[in-house]
Structures are given as C-alpha cells and as structure tokens.
Amino acid sequence: VIHCDAATICPDGTTCCLSPYGVWYCCPFSMGQCCRDGIHCCRHGYHCDSTSTHCLR
C-alpha cells in the first residue's frame, strides 16, 4: 500500500492525489499525473488539459 498521509492509503500501483479541498484520492495509475479538479488523473507521461477532463501527451 501507499500511505498518502497518516489516515489515507492507496493500493500499490496507484498514485496519491490531493484535491484542492484537501481530500486525498487514489489515481489508478502508477506515477500518475493528478489533475487540478481533484477528481481526474492521467497515466504517467500524460498531463491534464485545462478542463481536467482529458489527458494529453
């Protein structure tokens, strides 16, 4: 498991992402890129577009 903080864990092979509201969520990709909206994330090597709804290379 991955410890995001003292109270939050994510499964191995995922990435901890901190939302703008201070809530942790698990991105289902190892070394994922967390989007600013606090909901979405992208695979390693991709980044979020300005709407945080699409991943760009």
Curated annotation (Swiss-Prot):
| Tissue specificity note | Ubiquitous.
Record flagged with keyword Transport: no
Q: Which organism is it from?
A: Cyprinus carpio (Common carp)
Where found, per UniProt? Secreted
- Please give the Gene Ontology molecular function terms for this protein: cytokine activity
Q: Which InterPro entries match?
A: Granulin (IPR000118), Granulin_fam (IPR039036), Granulin_sf (IPR037277)
Q: What modifications follow translation?
A: Granulins are disulfide bridged.
Q: What keywords sit in the KW lines?
A: Cytokine, Disulfide bond, Secreted
Which family does the similarity line name?
Answer: Belongs to the granulin family.
This chain belongs to the protein called: Granulin-1
Annotated function: Granulins have possible cytokine-like activity. They may play a role in inflammation, wound repair, and tissue remodeling.
Q: Which GO terms describe its cellular component?
A: extracellular space
One Pfam family assigned to this protein is Granulin
Q: List the disulfide bonds.
A: 4-16, 10-26
